[in-house]
Amino acid sequence: MARAWVCLAGAAFFLSCLVLHSRFCGSLVSRTFSFHVSWRMEDPLFRLDLGWPKNSEYFTGATFCVAVDSLNGLVYVAQRGDNIPKVLVFSEDGYFLRAWNYTVDTPHGMFVSGTPFEQSVWITDVGSGPYGHTVKKYNSLGDLVQVLGTPGKKGTGLNPLQFDNPAELYVDDTGEMYIVDGDGGLNNRLVKLSQDFMILWLRGENGTGPAKFNIPHSVTLDAVGRVWVADRGNKRLQVFDKDTGEWLGAWDNCFTEEGPSAVRFTPDGKYLIVAQLNLSRLSVLLAPPSGSIGDCSVVSTIQLADQVLPHLLEVDRKTGAVYVAEIGAKQIQKYIPWHSRTPAFGA
């Protein structure tokens, strides 16, 4: 009997070491796993890469967003603060490469698009200074290439196109762009632009009904031509047809406590990864097949420490790694698929 109790205690200690990890101000970051009735633990989907980044001292401000250049193995981070680099560039294995701080006022969201030979780094800027209320395109070295919106001036206009606190964007493989505008500003809308930045369709206004928004905060696409928007203030995900902008439905049953602040799909299209800012929680949702979106179903969650505040996230489309921008903890954390060959505890 004594030997049985010793084995049981040892197993409990080992399990606690797996589930808990201290990373933020000495607080515990816990993983929420699913259990069978028989108390056998299911395989978790993601694990924290404790070795990323190698150079965390470069996080000197509030890390609002992160973007991944999957083709070239680069990770871009945008942070806010005075007299600090606004954009940091890391390798996918966590080494700091360079920083730039040109014509960036107050970054909110970012996205990387392009080819192996030419990469574009898009940043939404919500600042009130001369660079704010814009969506800007940079090359990988930080040179400004394109500006959408009226720099330093918020507005609702469509010709020319104006923004007020544009929250985030997504660029598909054809170069067409989806922008959610804005984060508490004049506009509550989803805008689709062509490759040459002409408006193809626009949906939304302030409200709670179908195709209306209250802080559209994040946007992404699935593999079957649907646009997913994190309608944060209305505590739901709204879904639209990629080509026509037709409203296809909404998920709200997963967000009774707080709305989603970020949404992305895993590369295989099986799951959505969603962040809830003030709950400091990441949720993995089961993605619907083509056709009706059905109801929201939570597969697993990762509960972070209080005040970590995951704001936006990105998924590496090649490796499946999830990078989370945490404005409270002022860091980026990387989660890798559980069965990845990358060591969980770094090198």
Curated annotation (Swiss-Prot):
Q: Which SUPFAM superfamilies match?
A: NHL repeat (SSF101898)
Q: Which intervals of the chain form a coiled coil?
A: none
What keywords would UniProt list here? Glycoprotein, Repeat, Signal
Give the signal peptide as a residue range, or say none if absent: 1-22
Checking Pfam families in the record gives: NHL
Q: Does the keyword section mention Signal?
A: yes
Glycosylated residues in this chain: N101, N206, N278
Entry annotated with the keyword Signal = yes
**What stretches of residues are NHL repeats?**
47-93, 150-196, 200-243, 294-338
**Protein name listed in UniProt:** NHL repeat-containing protein 3
